[in-house]
């Protein structure tokens, strides 16, 4: 199997490209849409607020939220989500161990 060629810096000396802002935002929209099908919206709002207070409105915050939601969905599916063909027949909410903030019911 041939190795993929390494990316070289552009001739004009600009840095190597990163995934575009639009790509990260699109991935976040998709994973958030999927998470809303499986988790309590209040929990997702609390998670979003927590990450926003840590990272603000930055791409780093978006990446962190993507990472947490991916892990939560993976764990949920492996435990046996009722909507999924992965894992067993039923699964619990892996985020239920996170305490609900006092001002949320």
From Swiss-Prot:
Localization (cell): Virion; Host nucleus
Cystine residue pairs: none
Keywords, ordered alphabetically: Activator, AIDS, Cell cycle, Host G2/M cell cycle arrest by virus, Host nucleus, Host-virus interaction, Modulation of host cell cycle by virus, Phosphoprotein, Transcription, Transcription regulation, Viral penetration into host nucleus, Virion, Virus entry into host cell
Gene Ontology terms: cellular component: host cell; host cell nucleus; virion component
GO BP term, pick one: viral penetration into host nucleus
Sections of the chain in a coiled coil: none
Region (Disordered): 84-105
Pfam family membership, one: VPR
InterPro entries assigned: RetroV_VpR/X
Annotated positions of the Phosphoserine modification: 84
Cited function: Stimulates gene expression driven by the HIV-2 LTR. Prevents infected cells from undergoing mitosis and proliferating, by inducing arrest or delay in the G2 phase of the cell cycle. Cell cycle arrest creates a favorable environment for maximizing viral expression and production.
Subunit structure: Interacts with human UNG.
Record-given protein name: Protein Vpr
Organism: Human immunodeficiency virus type 2 subtype A (isolate ROD)
């Amino acid at each position: 199997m041939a190795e993929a060629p390494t990316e070289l810096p552009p001739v004009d000396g600009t840095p190597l490209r990163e995934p575009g802002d639009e790509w990260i935002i699109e991935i976040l929209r998709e994973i958030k849409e999927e998470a809303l099908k499986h988790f309590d919206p209040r929990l997702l709002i609390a998670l979003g607020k927590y990450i926003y207070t840590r990272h603000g409105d930055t791409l780093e915050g978006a990446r962190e939220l993507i990472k947490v939601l991916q892990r939560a969905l993976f764990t949920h599916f492996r435990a046996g989500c009722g909507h999924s063909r992965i894992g067993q027949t039923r699964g619990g909410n892996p985020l239920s161990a996170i305490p609900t903030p006092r001002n949320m019911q």
